[in-house]
């Protein structure tokens, strides 16, 4: 059985009973979307499995040792690379550390990170107002700013990935302000 199939079953079991805050849907919808995005982008089975498992350490009783035992060192390392450090205080600091952590872990971790961000941005409603600052809550604005910073990092490293293009499109659809494209010199 492919590792991703086992990962899906495990993630569904771990996330059983959890609901998404944004719409009350079963939480497992999010990891399934992340895994599907990775599959569509041509990722390998270990990467897809990591996408399906990416929230298990943060949101369930799972730990890295259990993931390593069940799914192998590579998949567990990818999950760890996209798992927030709960000991870092403050949203901005914690999210910046997570972005650096995914970046340092390499292209496969960045793909999982990108797929997660695409899925999370899709949870935000499309902004229809002229000025985002006039109508958007500070929480939403903070999240959009975080996702824009993630996009900048991802474009520097895996800019040719369809996931990065999707993230840009999703952000632009939800933003009254166009997302800045890095200059060619920035990408070098």
PLM segments and residue spans:
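Active-site helical microenvironments for divalent-metal-assisted chemistry
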Residues: 1-188
């Amino acid at each position: 059985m492919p590792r991703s199939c086992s990962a899906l079953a495990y993630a569904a079991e771990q996330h059983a009973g959890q609901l998404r805050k944004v719409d009350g849907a079963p939480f497992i919808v999010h990891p399934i979307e992340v895994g599907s995005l990775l599959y569509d982008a041509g990722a390998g089975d270990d990467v897809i499995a990591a996408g399906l498992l990416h929230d298990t350490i943060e949101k369930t009783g799972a730990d890295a040792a259990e993931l390593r035992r069940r799914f192998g060192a590579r998949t567990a390392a990818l999950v760890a690379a996209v798992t927030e450090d709960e000991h870092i205080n403050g949203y901005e600091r914690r999210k910046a550390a997570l972005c650096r952590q995914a970046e340092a872990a390499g292209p496969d971790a960045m793909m999982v990170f990108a797929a997660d961000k695409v899925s999370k941005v899709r949870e935000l409603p499309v902004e229809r107002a002229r000025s985002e600052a006039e109508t958007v809550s500070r929480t939403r604005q903070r999240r959009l700013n975080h996702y824009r910073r993630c996009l900048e990092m991802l474009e520097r490293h895996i800019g040719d990935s369809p996931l990065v293009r999707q993230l840009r499109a999703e952000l632009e659809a939800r933003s009254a302000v166009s997302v800045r494209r890095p200059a060619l010199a920035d990408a070098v």
